Amino acid sequence: MLKTAGGYESMITKYISELVSYGKANGLIEECDEIYVTNRLLELFDVMEYDVKNENSDAKDLSESQKCENSEEKHEAASFRPVHEILEDMMKYAFENGIMKEDTITAKDLFDTKIMGCITPPPSIVRKEFKDKYAVSPKVATDFYYSFSQASNYIRKDRIARDEKWVTDTEYGEIDITINLSKPEKDPRDIAKAGKAKKSGYPACLLCKENEGYAGHFSHPARQNHRIIPVTLDGQQYYMQYSPYVYYNEHCIIFNAEHTPMKIDHAVFKKILDFVRQFP
């Protein structure tokens, strides 16, 4: 379906307005970012017209307690559609208008992450807020970071909800059982495309710090909405992130600033104890 200046194109501007309002309500962007972020999204969807008055009136109004200047309240989101539903509508428009060339799982994951990258604050902002909240308490800081990772759709809550979890009694005590269903199966078309893609050694692996903001491709996930937190452990630079697949509650990953082989030795346990000291 070709876009027109009329009804169908007006739908994408409504979705853009809805996503911008979602971003403000969830603390991803502030009021002063609204025009900038809207323009980035209009560029992404190749839209030339935007009725500011109508789109702003159609967007859900935020109460005073939900405006960005009240930083303690900004994560108390208004009642919006789940972000994956907004993104699904945006991707449908993108595919039908030739902006997104394929509609496979990987192609959609690459594109919706690119969308979310437009409303995800830069590393400096996220790290400053984490540091400010850490000054209150480590728990306040990590709670913020976990909520942020969900709001940015780095942790895809709709997929995590599919996981099967239960506790079973055994002769050794209770054991938590998890069947992880949040990581989607590869489409054969994606596998074929990844096999033909030019090989790249950047980033060196899926955990390296260079993944932050990376666009990704058919054999490497997009990470435009990914933000990492620096931590110093036993005098060495490390980074912290939450796992996008949440294999267990608030699944956290700590990784070296350098791409180095994983090795279990005395130094590792010193770093683990240092981390626990900083985040009791």
For the regions a protein language model found, what residue spans apply to each?
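Active-site microenvironments that recognize anionic phosphate/pyrophosphate groups
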Residues: 1-266
